[in-house]
Amino acid sequence: MAMSPYIFIVLILIILSMYRERTVKPGKLLIIPLLLLWGVSASFQPAYFHSVLHVAISGILLLIGLACGFGIGKMVNVRIHPETGKVTSRGSLGSVILILVILSLRMAARTWLPESNEMFIAIIHSMFFVPLGTITARNIMLYKAYRRLTAGKVSIQ
């Protein structure tokens, strides 16, 4: 499998975007996983979930994604910005490494599994559940940190 330069550009953009400090918007934390869920559900054929193997693999990959997302969510730095008073978040080095490992495993799955195998087809189709679980769990952790920080924040007028 030849690595194109686009993959390296995407990896660099992911690293830079995770290190950038952003304002946490609680409404956006809910909308993004819902849009991703809609995209994942729209990409499947209705007959896909009739096989127990496909349902089991999809469930396992969703659990793996949730576990990775909770790990990433625990590593994200969330604070109240001293100048603006807004809640901001910034990714840590550990969360960047975990995202890169997940992306590498997704790209390597095609070379590790033979294409004629039913397990290969089920895993490739279910790979969408890993980012769905990761983003959902990360956003849950961000929302919990946001609520914790804003609950103790007192507005002085």
Curated annotation (Swiss-Prot):
The chain crosses the membrane at residues 29-49, 52-72, 93-113, 117-137. It comes from the Bacteria. The keyword Transcription does not apply. It comes from Bacillus subtilis (strain 168). GO terms for cellular component: plasma membrane. It is found in: Cell membrane. The keyword Metal-binding does not apply. It is a multi-pass membrane protein. The gene is yxjN. Keywords: Cell membrane, Membrane, Transmembrane, Transmembrane helix. This is Uncharacterized protein YxjN.
